[in-house]
Amino acid sequence: METQQIKETIEMISEENLDIRTITMGISLLDCVTGDLQTTADKVYAKIMAKAANLVPVADAISDEYGIPIVNKRISVTPVSLLAGADQNLDFRPIAQAMDRAAKDLGVDLIGGYTALVQNGSTPAETALMKSLPEVLDTTERVCASVNIGSTRSGLNMDAVKLMGTVVKEVAMRKPQNAMKLVVFCNAVEDNPFMAGAFWGISEGDVAINTGVSGPGVVERAIAAKPAASFEEICETIKQTAFKVSRMGQFVGKVAADRLDVPFNIVDLSLAPTPAKGDSVAQILETMGLSHVGTPGTTAALALLNDAVKKGGIMAAERVGGLSGAFIPVSEDANMITAAAKGQISLEKLEAMTAVCSVGLDMVAVPGDTPDATISGMIADEAAIGMINNKTTAVRVIPVPGKQVGDIVEFGGIFGTAPIMAINDGDAQQFINRGGRIPAPIHSFKN
């Protein structure tokens, strides 16, 4: 690298909030399956402890050695619903407790993979896991959960959509923060390093390292330096910046994998914001020339950003994967929080933005009395966007008991502040109750 590029990278870290958002170790648990879920749980704990024993020390050492902040150390595991084996009891709580205990003992921030993949239908084990979510997320601290209810090739499992509307509500009624650990997906990916939706897919290897980078502040400052630039110049600026950001993720991931003696898998190119000043994806869109996020033109600006990040980042990494784009979590983005609190952005506009961004309706707080069917409708709408457009979409919605539109909820830390957003008061009950499946779109048939 040229001296100027090295200086720019140092400035990105020291002044513009550039960091490695996560190093996530994926671990297969398929070899832990026995005929008894308690025995399986014991094997799960033992394998996680063995494979990830040095994850945190190695990540901390790399951070100290190279001066690169590594914010989170995480683990993703095989979808737990696949671990039932021959046990007819279908009580997955021991496995959840084993995962939580391992995460605490290892010092990792979160562990994902309490997951069911039900896009084609639900087995008894998967139904049991979904119904266990309210209790499991309330009795564990670091376990994250996800459910994939649809895909472009399979269509949408509307029975699961209905169930998850009820489950999300029950999860949040115990404690709103519990809902932050649950994501409902369409087209979920197997190598996502970001929580709460990470799980280690069954086509992945035994163990590997994935990294997720973050640099909204870096991109924003680069664009701000060119106030009169054309769209082509803006795209080129974002691509060059994304290359540097992603190169750092590739470097750190390779070093970590070498030291842990495991394969390096992918870099997730996503721009992940935090509530910190200058670490906002929404601010990037505003710097492009929008008075505030939510203004007409917001979706186009986000599409430009998302595509340019991918084009720049893909040249910097051996393999890219995960979600790779720009996250728009309402409560975790300072400028998004401001726009939502002022009523400058609506759920409907957020939904439109999800058609071109990395994932979906993320960290959205709604009134606690929102009906189950309405939440199911939100999930179905978001999943339909993913199904038709062949992209990953998701819903991480938080019904907050006792709160109404205009109230503010403090989640704290990286989870930020959530203004309670207005939600359409129409009734989706009859639609959701129809049951069955919405078939896959015609363009899904590729063979």
Swiss-Prot record:
Report the domain of life of the source organism: Bacteria
What is the residue range of the signal peptide feature? none
Give one Pfam family, short name only: DUF711
Q: Which InterPro entries match?
A: UPF0210
Q: Tell me which NCBIfam families the record gives.
A: PRK05313.1
Q: Which PANTHER family match?
A: UPF0210 PROTEIN MJ1665, UPF0210 PROTEIN SPR0218
Membership in a protein family: Belongs to the UPF0210 family.
Q: Outline the subunit composition.
A: Homodimer.
Instruction: Report the protein name in the record.
Output: UPF0210 protein LSEI_0897
